[in-house]
Swiss-Prot record:
SUPFAM superfamilies: Class II aaRS and biotin synthetases, Putative anticodon-binding domain of alanyl-tRNA synthetase (AlaRS), ThrRS/AlaRS common domain, Translation proteins
Top-level class of the enzyme under EC nomenclature: ligase
Protein name: Alanine--tRNA ligase
Any one biological process term the GO annotation gives: alanyl-tRNA aminoacylation
Keyword annotations from UniProtKB, A to Z: Aminoacyl-tRNA synthetase, ATP-binding, Cytoplasm, Ligase, Metal-binding, Nucleotide-binding, Protein biosynthesis, RNA-binding, tRNA-binding, Zinc
One annotated GO molecular function: tRNA binding
SMART domains documented for this protein: tRNA_SAD
Superkingdom, natural source: Archaea
Organism this protein belongs to: Staphylothermus marinus (strain ATCC 43588 / DSM 3639 / JCM 9404 / F1)
Reactions mediated catalytically: tRNA(Ala) + L-alanine + ATP = L-alanyl-tRNA(Ala) + AMP + diphosphate
Entry's family note: Belongs to the class-II aminoacyl-tRNA synthetase family.
Length: 909
């Protein structure tokens, strides 16, 4: 069935006719007869050699400017680009297209767009095709600009649809870019993404797709197409491709990076094939699907250009480096923190692929860090003052710091990883694709190293050409982020509450209100909904209020408070039904509430302080505010120093001393974003037309549901009591505020007094006592070393005197339980390595057996065979041919068996 959007009037009126491509079988519209569509692989990049008299060459910046000017002159409001880190979404990590800015809030009619229609040129990042970067000479990029003009049609507001969209595309490409109408083809297509779908047209000119025009009329619900409440025009014009088309350079990289490409060639020592040769190769290969360098070599042989294979492979790696450095600069300058989860994982994936690419280009590990930092610096200089890319320069210190840290980490992983890979390969008879992913995910070791090591063991492994693309897809932008559940209400209660009108939130109107009257709207079991409430529910990491409901002379405790949409549900301590319409009094525990208010405001202050001390990349990764303390998880790539913690605390307390009045606003979504920036989404995405903004002027502003003090001075003071790295890329700060401070100090003093009393030094300064204890410990450590050495000499002499002789090999069995781990390990080492004695150490829980590697080799002895024997007796362990360790129950009872087994092994050997 042909979608109605493909039966449009504009194309017919303009003289376009429908044709069917003889190669791909798809329908397309053209002004001139054609057998095939001008889309690869049905056609080559004919644009590279065609003469377009009316098409002047445009730079990347000029192509963007012309696109914006055309649509603003046609009544479209201009929207500034958003970051590539999609903080306003809870189902995506990265901004993969311009429509992402408006999904799902605008596309589903929840929120009105800032303008209708609108135009935006959105830098985007897609990693699903990362392995194709370079190989396709610019058709695939990990970061690119998507020019989008969007219209949102509702029942009561028609803006424009198919005919107008096609008219805009036709006019832009003919009147602004200067392409002859006969060269422009509209190919029918279908598009899905971000939960929406619809028919589409691809705008093709001589082998290059310049734009896609999508008519988003469906949303995908449980895998099925459902009519969308808003008909969305979603267009994507490739700004880089438009510039490439007008310049007709051999690759898109020459157009995008221009002089920077030459700079990178000099730094990396790369020579491209001659310009004309490169252009010819790109043209001849443009209708081929090249998945890897092996296929590249095959096709070069077919077109008689195989002599350029080595040069072309290096050139492709050069293009990859250019692309990846730009993408990383985008990701990091927008605040992504490299880690092993979420968007941080994706950043690290690009970083490590870049590093591997540079190593393939012959960069030595010893100079890798310096080269990476130079490439980053040159990229920042190239983009300085140009569109959003100026932030590369502004945030260069952070980008360089992260890249330096990640490069050193990668070198360490690769260096240590060889041994781990060797062990893994020895265990596995055949390395699978899942094994490669496991090694990469758990150890960070790239598949290329596994391949190299496997060759030493006679294994041939072929890494899928799209390995990194598959990795990106597994961890990528389309998967939902894990969100903490705010409550565990029964489904029936959630369904019941959802049917009611929003509760009036008195705790927002006046958070200092301790008592208020309310009317019962409904109740079910112990759950009650009032028309209004002063009780704050558990939400946004803040604990719920405590208190009670006064019904006549009865005081009913409130056990828990929940938020279901805009309805506040109160759970009473007893199961009882309150009659709808009944008037009650609500009373909160003010002591509890006020502490929560101060801890919540303290959290906003600490977050602002952390950002000022550590950098703009700091973002809230989680938070909890309780009566006892508060915690804030922040994104940061390394542990905090004592000095950094001190500075954060000092800045936070300065804000308290400045006695700043907080401000509270209820603003439309896009107005809030424009006024305060996307940092308002510290607590995650908010899908609401109106946002509640809590501002500490000059310090912090966030979309926040919580209760706060009116002035920062009410907090009294903030003390950070703990700072730790809880996972890669996340630091947890724990702190207390207000009246918790004297309690904390009192608790600390009690612990100090206990310690001093235990040491018999009550009343003395703890630093003096600690110094004295430390000095005494050092003295006893020295004595212990001397005694250990003396005891070891005596024990070694005794053990050697009682040594067994097994087939000509001196053997010592140690059945004495040595609680001193350092001593027993030293004895095993001395006996096995220095004395060349087969050593069997038997403790209460394990057996450890060691021999000099040369002795094991000369006698063809493999101690691991003992592991197999002991595993049959319930033992667990492993090791090397010359050293094994086995945990086993009651090992002393099988000493005789162990000796017999060793005797059999030795005598047979």
């Amino acid at each position: 069935m042909v979608e109605e959007e493909f039966m449009n009037e504009f194309l017919k009126k303009t003289g376009y006719q429908v044709y069917k491509c003889k190669k791909c079988g798809e329908r397309f519209w053209s002004l001139v007869p054609r057998d095939t569509c001008p889309d690869r692989p049905c056609s080559k990049y004919d644009f590279l050699y065609n003469e377009y008299k009316g098409v002047p060459p445009l730079t990347f910046d000029e192509a963007r400017r012309k696109f914006i000017e055309f649509f603003t002159s046609h009544g479209h409001g201009y929207v500034d680009p958003y970051p590539v880190l999609a903080r306003w979404r809870n189902d995506l990590y990265l901004t993969i297209a311009s429509i992402i800015v408006f999904q799902p809030a605008v596309t589903e009619g929840i929120v009105d767009p800032p303008y209708n229609p609108l135009v935006i040129v959105q830098p985007s990042v897609r990693l699903e095709d990362i392995d194709n970067v370079g190989l396709t000479f610019g058709r695939h990029l990990t970061s690119f600009e998507m020019g989008g003009h969007h219209a949102f049609n509702k029942k009561d507001q028609y803006v424009y649809w198919v005919n107008e969209t096609l008219q805009y595309a036709f006019d832009f490409f003919t009147k602004i870019i200067g392409i002859e109408p006969e060269n422009i083809v509209f190919k029918e297509s279908w598009w899905e993404g971000g939960g929406n779908a619809g028919p589409a047209y691809e705008v093709l000119v001589d082998g290059l797709e310049l734009a896609t025009l999508v008519f988003m009329k469906y949303k995908i619900v449980n895998g099925k197409k459902v009519r969308n409440p808003v008909l969305v025009v979603d267009t994507g014009y490739g700004i880089e491709r438009i510039a490439w088309f007008t310049q007709r350079t051999p690759t898109a990289f020459h157009t995008i990076f221009s002089s920077l490409l030459e700079t990178y060639k000099n730094i990396l020592g790369i020579d491209e094939p001659p310009y004309d040769v490169l252009k010819k190769i790109v043209y001849l290969l443009s209708d081929k699907e090249i998945e890897d360098v092996y296929m590249l070599n095959k096709y070069l042989e077919e077109i008689d250009y195989s002599e350029y294979y080595k040069s072309l492979v290096d050139t492709i790696n050069l293009y990859t480096a250019l692309d990846h450095v730009k993408t990383l600069s985008l990701m990091l300058s927008d605040g992504i923190v490299s880690s092993n989860t979420g968007e941080g994982y994706l950043a690290r994936l690009v970083i490590r692929r870049l590093l591997r690419t540079l190593i393939r280009l012959g960069i030595k590990v010893s100079t890798l860090e310096d080269i990476v930092l130079e490439l980053i610096d040159k990229q920042a200089k190239y983009w300085k003052g140009r569109y959003v890319y100026d932030k590369f320069h502004r945030r260069l210190d952070y980008i360089l710091d992260v890249m330096s840290y990640e490069t050193r980490k990668y070198i360490d992983i690769v260096t240590r990883g060889i041994r781990e890979v060797d062990r893994f390969i020895k265990k596995k008879k055949k390395i699978t694709f899942d094994d490669l992913i496991q090694i990469y995910d758990s150890k960070g070791i790239p598949p290329e190293i596994v391949v190299e090591r496997a060759k030493h063991y006679g294994q041939e492994i072929r890494v899928p050409s799209n390995f990194y693309s598959l990795i990106a897809a597994r961890h990528g932008g389309s998967q939902a982020l894990i969100k903490e559940k705010e409550h565990e209400l029964p489904d029936e209660i959630v369904e019941w509450a959802s049917k009611h009108d929003p509760t009036k939130k008195l705790f927002h109107e006046n958070p200092y209100l301790r008592r208020a009257s309310a009317k019962v709207l409904d109740s079910l079991n112990e759950y009650v909904i009032f028309d209004q409430t002063i009780f704050y529910p558990r939400a946004g990491g803040q604990d719920h209020d405590k208190g009670y409901v006064i019904l006549g002379n009865e005081h009913i405790p409130v056990k828990h408070v929940y938020k279901v949409g805009e309805v506040i549900v109160h759970q009473l301590a007893t199961k009882r039904r309150l009659v709808p319409g009944t008037q009650v009094e609500l009373v909160i525990d003010w002591y509890n509430r006020y502490r929560l208010m101060r801890h919540h405001t303290a959290t906003h202050i600490v977050l602002g302080a952390a950002r000022k001390v550590l950098g703009e990349h700091v973002w809230q990764a989680g938070a909890e505010k309780t009566v006892e303390k508060a915690r804030l998880d922040i994104t940061h790539y390394k542990s905090l120093s004592d000095e950094e913690i001190r500075k954060i605390e000092e800045l936070a307390n300065k804000v308290i001393d400045e006695r700043i009045d907080l401000k509270f606003y209820f603003l439309p979504k896009f107005e809030a974003e424009k006024r305060f920036g996307l940092r308002i989404y510290q607590g995650g995405a908010v899908y609401s037309p109106i946002l509640r903004i809590v501002e500490i002027p000059g310090w912090d502003a966030e979309a926040c549901f919580g209760t706060h003090v009116y002035n920062t001075s009410e907090i009294g003071g903030i003390k950070i009591i703990k700072a730790e790295k809880i996972q890669d890329g996340v630091i947890r700060l724990e702190y207390i505020a207000s009246t918790r401070l004297p309690e904390y100090i009192s608790d600390l003093q009690k612990e100090v007094d206990k310690a001093l009393k235990f040491l018999g030094a009550k009343g003395l300064p703890i630093s003096i006592v600690a110094k004295k204890v430390s000095e005494e410990l050092d003295k006893y450590k020295t004595l212990l070393i001397q005694y250990r050495r003396l005891f070891k000499e005596i024990l070694l002499k005794h053990l050697l005197e009682e040594a067994l002789e097994i087939c000509g090999l001196k053997t010592v069995v140690i059945e004495k339980q040595l609680e001193d781990e350092q001593l027993y390990k030293s004895i095993i080492e001395d006996l096995s390595l220095k004395k060349r004695v087969l050593t069997i150490y038997v403790s209460d829980k394990f057996v450890e057996i060691a021999i000099h590697p040369d002795e094991a080799n000369n006698r063809k002895l493999d101690l691991r065979k003992l592991v197999e024997i002991l595993q049959n007796m319930g033992g667990r362990g492993g090791g090397k041919p010359d050293h094994i360790y086995i945990k086993i129950k009651e090992p002393k009872q099988i000493v005789k068996l162990i000796v017999e087994a060793i005797t059999n092994l030795l005598c047979k050997a």
